[in-house]
């Protein structure tokens, strides 16, 4: 088996890998388009001269400018932090489908409020709209990865949850380029900077429409006792009849897991809270999932996403139009590499190895960029023309993007969506998403001050954190590719961690062979398309 081979936990009919499951993942991932667009457009929009003129930016002190810009950016993350936890009761009681609908409606309300912002009214509507939009995307960042992972066959679960990350990057690509577009094509005016705010309504509108046609998660339906509807939805998604051996195995595994949970954690709304505090295994896994987002934000990605003009200025890029263009190229690189990650890497190379490679390569690149800024001091030069050293620094910045994007950008979301049992999954994802938005908030809130005080030290700071993340992943995070959701407990109990994947996958295949042998002995035989029971005359 090569490193780029798909890993199946058992023989899987080709019907399982059908277009319907990709369509469901794509519709749900409109949530991440909302997130990606918002994270990309806001920093470049508030750097437009038309925005600064309308709000009399030049009359503010430098410290006041940093405060206002960090407030505009970080209030969104603050709302998203609370939205991630707000999604838990919605996802538990209403389901994944209607949870996605609620997140889209709240985001749309927030985006609409932002459109009322102008110089006369000040920043109040903008602040309020950012908080509401954050609530919406925070809820969506909880529910979407869970929904997709609960639909997915193990062999392509990473790829399908990766569609969520792809949506994030497509939204980001549009967000990075739209400000370059309005700066090139429209004269400085209120219209020039309000158009990027209005575009937020497109992905949320698509999600509202698409959510009406989504199938509810079969695993959530099983959890709520709606068995017939769950089996019907699962058969529709898998494109197989209920009595096919693959379906018998999957339904049996879900039943067995729920029965185990009923006897241990319990299936009620409050049971996961009690389990999280009393069960050390669950608490430990919550810690791992939350820490993945600490290390993700410790790479510096959100400092770059939200304040890309500041980042490029520190390297020596001058001129607002040039800064917008280089930011757009950053978005293109991320999107292209995300396609590669989605189609060839996440389910073939695996989660763990990608994190290790990305952290090592990304750290080296940031050390080089920081060293260039320390030695060359490009922001202090009278000659603003970028020299060979500056071009090399830009190369290593984009190389950092190539290392980071297929590793730490989307992989933590994939791992968190698959590493918990069904009844704890919503709460666990809320904790993971909340952790993401907490660190996101802190980075976005203090990045302007960090660049003002630390200068090149910002790059050394993030490079050091990426080195530390290698130790964390190697000793604590097992490989999860190809492992059924119902077997995650066994994976995290297998030691040593760096060999757990191979050990458990071998056990699962042996168990599956015994199951099929016992099934055939009990009166089932294979036919071309399905399994038929043998009845003696």
From Swiss-Prot:
Protein function: Integral membrane transporter that imports quinic acid to be catabolized as a carbon source.
UniProt-recorded Gene Ontology molecular function terms: carbohydrate:proton symporter activity
GO cellular component: plasma membrane
Regions that span the bilayer: 23-43, 75-95, 98-118, 131-151, 160-180, 194-214, 286-306, 326-346, 353-373, 388-408, 457-477
Xref: Pfam families: Sugar_tr
PTM description: Ubiquitinated. Deubiquitinated by creB, probably to control its activity or amount.
One BP annotation, GO: quinate metabolic process
Subunit record text: Interacts with creB.
Residue spans, topological domain Extracellular: 44-74, 119-130, 181-193, 307-325, 374-387, 478-537
Name the record gives this protein: Probable quinate permease
Ranges facing Cytoplasmic side: 1-22, 96-97, 152-159, 215-285, 347-352, 409-456
Coiled-coil regions, chain positions: none
Record's subcellular location: Cell membrane
Similarity field: Belongs to the major facilitator superfamily. Sugar transporter (TC 2.A.1.1) family.
Organism from which the protein derives: Aspergillus oryzae (strain ATCC 42149 / RIB 40) (Yellow koji mold)
């Amino acid at each position: 088996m090569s490193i780029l081979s798909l890993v199946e936990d058992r023989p899987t009919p080709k019907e399982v890998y059908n277009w319907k499951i990709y369509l469901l993942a794509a519709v749900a991932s409109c949530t991440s388009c909302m997130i990606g667009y918002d994270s990309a457009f806001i920093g470049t929009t508030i750097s437009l001269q038309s925005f600064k003129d309308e709000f009399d930016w030049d009359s503010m002190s430098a410290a006041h400018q940093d405060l206002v810009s960090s407030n505009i950016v970080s209030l969104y993350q603050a709302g998203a932090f609370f939205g991630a936890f707000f999604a838990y009761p919605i996802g538990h009681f209403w389901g994944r489908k209607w949870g996605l609908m609620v997140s889209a409606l709240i985001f749309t309300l927030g985006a609409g409020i932002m459109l009322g912002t102008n110089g006369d009214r000040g920043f109040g509507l903008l602040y309020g709209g950012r908080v509401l939009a954050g609530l919406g995307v925070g809820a969506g960042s909880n529910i979407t990865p869970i929904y997709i992972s609960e639909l997915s066959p193990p062999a392509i679960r990473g790829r399908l949850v990766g569609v969520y990350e792809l949506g994030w990057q497509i939204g980001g690509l549009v967000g990075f380029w739209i400000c370059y577009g309005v700066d090139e094509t429209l004269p400085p005016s209120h219209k020039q900077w309000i158009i990027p705010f209005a575009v937020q309504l497109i992905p949320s509108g698509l999600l509202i429409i698409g959510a009406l046609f989504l199938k509810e998660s079969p695993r959530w339906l099983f959890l709520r006792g709606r068995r017939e509807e769950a089996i019907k939805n699962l058969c529709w998604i898998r494109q197989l009849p209920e009595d096919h051996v693959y379906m018998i195995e999957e339904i049996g595994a879900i039943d067995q897991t729920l029965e185990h949970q009923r006897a241990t954690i319990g299936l009620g709304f409050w049971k996961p809270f009690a389990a999280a505090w009393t069960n050390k295994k669950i608490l430990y896994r919550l810690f791992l999932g939350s820490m993945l987002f600490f290390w993700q934000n410790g790479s510096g990605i959100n400092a770059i996403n939200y304040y890309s003009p500041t980042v490029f200025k520190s390297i020596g890029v001058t001129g607002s139009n040039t800064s917008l263009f280089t930011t757009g190229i950053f978005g293109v690189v991320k999107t292209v590499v995300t396609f590669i990650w989605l189609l060839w890497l996440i389910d073939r190379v695996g989660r763990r190895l990608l994190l290790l490679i990305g952290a090592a390569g990304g750290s080296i690149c940031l050390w080089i960029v920081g060293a260039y800024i320390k030695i060359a001091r490009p922001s202090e030069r009278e000659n603003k023309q970028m020299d060979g050293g500056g071009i090399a620094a830009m190369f290593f910045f984009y190389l950092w993007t190539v290392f980071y994007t297929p590793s730490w950008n989307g992989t933590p979301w994939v791992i968190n969506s698959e590493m918990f049992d069904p009844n704890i999954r919503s709460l666990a994802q809320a904790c993971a998403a909340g952790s993401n938005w907490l660190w996101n908030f802190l980075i976005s809130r203090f990045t302007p001050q960090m660049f003002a005080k630390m200068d090149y030290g910002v790059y050394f700071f993030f490079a050091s954190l990426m080195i530390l993340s290698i130790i964390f992943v190697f000793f604590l995070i097992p490989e999860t590719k190809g492992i059924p959701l119902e077997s995650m407990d066994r994976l995290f109990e297998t030691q040593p961690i760096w060999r757990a994947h191979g050990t458990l996958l071998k056990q699962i295949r042996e168990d599956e062979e015994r199951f099929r042998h016992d099934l055939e002995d009990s009166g089932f035989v294979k036919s071309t398309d399905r399994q038929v029971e043998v009845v003696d005359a």
